[in-house]
């Protein structure tokens, strides 16, 4: 019997319904969030131990990013295996690689850290890291709404305004002594997230930070820096929050001017232009036995132990042939070691407990696009997915990752068709948001996405419940 986790055991049916309609009304009142998910009457409650896990995870992941950054830089210089940088650079334009390696940006790592965490029967598992995540504004808005439902008694993780205030603190730390405002640049490719970023910019202004969400084409370049028109007044830009993907740079108006301004120190840009730090194959590098001495030296013992526990086994799907006597490290089909990727094509459904997905730098590398779950596919389709991944290596490397099944949660949501609150059995993705300010990490909030139990890939969808997380009270 899998563990279940109810969230609103003390609410009457009428009270639960009223709370859902209040949430829907508040969201509708923003005129920004088209509610395309199921609304729960309560936040998802985590235990004190689970909160402790997430509080400790942020510093561990910052250490991981710093270690990955060092590993890449040392690989470029030949101080670590050169194949590390070769893999992380695969499929990237040379101009971007040279820019990312500039001395000015050498120590920069993402200031927003958001792992996707799956609660399983055996503990938490991180499926991937996202340094350009959506959901910041949405999680901030939901945190405010659910906090207000209980007049602050629900103990929302991060607090009512934790997402906004910690995001503002992170941006101020990047601004340092630079004059000017914050420009949240949202590309056309990311336009679905523009409403929440507009809302977030408004909240930042209420916190006293001059911040504006604009399209890249709206900014103006001069030799003195970047400018934007806000409320009828032209303002210098001190910080650019990059809400666009690096693979999309050729489609970003004025992208080269933004890079030039950052190179000259006229503006700070975060997340940094470092494609090596946005590859899912980083998890494969963490588990690679040749690199274990590096990680053990780079990370503190507790950090190494915890990350080994939560980062799933991952392999980069490189089609290069292995010597006849070699095997792929720690990859097995049952008791059998795997020496060739083609061995996986004939794996049974039970043996296909794997996920194939693009490593990064591709429009297929976010959301559920490009993801193939082995045991959820007929054998022929699994073979096709594997062969396609291997064939894509020159331009878009793919990874193979061990699949971990989420544990079941019993949730309640507002069924619009029935005009009633009903129960759903689902599996959960927890997305904690960490913001880095002056070298320290703060957990600002956690968004729960509860998908129907039959879904293998957990992501935002119309059949999913989205809710902030709170601390379970006794």
Question: Which residues does each PLM region occupy?
Answer:
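Preference for protein termini
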Residues: 1-474
């Amino acid at each position: 019997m899998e563990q279940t986790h109810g969230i609103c055991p003390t609410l009457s049916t009428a009270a639960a319904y009223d709370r859902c309609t209040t949430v829907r009304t508040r969201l509708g009142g923003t005129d920004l969030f088209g509610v395309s998910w199921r609304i729960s009457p309560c936040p998802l409650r985590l235990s004190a131990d689970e909160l402790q896990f997430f509080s400790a995870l942020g510093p561990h992941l910052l250490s991981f990013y710093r270690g990955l950054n060092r590993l890449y830089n040392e690989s470029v210089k030949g101080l670590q295996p050169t194949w590390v940088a070769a893999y992380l650079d695969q499929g990237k334009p040379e101009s971007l690689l040279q820019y990312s390696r500039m001395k000015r940006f050498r120590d920069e790592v993402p200031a927003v850290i958001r792992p996707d965490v799956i609660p399983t029967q055996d503990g938490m598992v991180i499926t991937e890291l996202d340094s350009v995540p959506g959901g910041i504004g949405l999680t901030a808005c939901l945190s405010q709404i659910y906090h207000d439902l209980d007049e602050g008694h629900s103990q929302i993780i991060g607090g009512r305004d934790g997402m906004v205030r910690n995001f503002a603190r992170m941006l101020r730390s990047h601004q340092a002594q630079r004059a000017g405002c914050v420009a949240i640049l949202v590309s056309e490719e990311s336009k679905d997230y523009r409403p929440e970023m507009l809302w977030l910019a408004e909240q930042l202004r209420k916190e006293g930070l001059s911040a504006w969400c604009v399209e890249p084409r709206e900014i103006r370049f001069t030799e003195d820096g970047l400018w934007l028109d806000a409320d009828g007044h032209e303002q210098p830009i001190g910080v650019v929050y990059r809400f666009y993907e690096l693979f999309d740079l050729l489609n970003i108006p004025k992208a080269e001017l933004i890079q030039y301004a950052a190179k000259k120190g006229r503006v700070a840009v975060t997340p940094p232009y470092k494609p090596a730090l946005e590859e899912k194959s980083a998890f494969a590098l963490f588990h690679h036995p040749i690199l274990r001495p590096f990680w053990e030296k780079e990370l503190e013992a507790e950090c190494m132990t915890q990350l080994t526990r939560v980062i799933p086994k991952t392999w980069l799907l490189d089609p290069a042939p292995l010597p006849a006597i070699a095997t792929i490290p720690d990859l097995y089909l049952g008791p059998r070691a795997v020496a060739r990727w083609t061995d996986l094509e004939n794996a049974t459904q039970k043996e296909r407990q794997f996920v194939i997905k693009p490593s990064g730098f591709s429009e297929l590398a976010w959301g559920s696009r490009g993801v193939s779950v082995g045991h959820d596919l007929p054998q022929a389709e699994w073979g096709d997915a594997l062969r396609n991944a291997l064939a894509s290596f020159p331009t878009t490397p793919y990874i193979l990752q061990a699949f971990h099944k989420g544990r079941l949660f019993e949730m309640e949501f507002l069924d619009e068709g029935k005009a009633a609150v009903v129960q759903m059995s689902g599996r959960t993705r927890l997305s904690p948001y960490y913001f880095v300010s002056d070298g320290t990490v703060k957990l600002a909030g956690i968004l729960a996405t509860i998908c129907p139990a039959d879904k293998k890939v957990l992501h935002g969808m119309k059949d999913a419940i989205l809710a902030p997380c709170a601390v379970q009270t006794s």
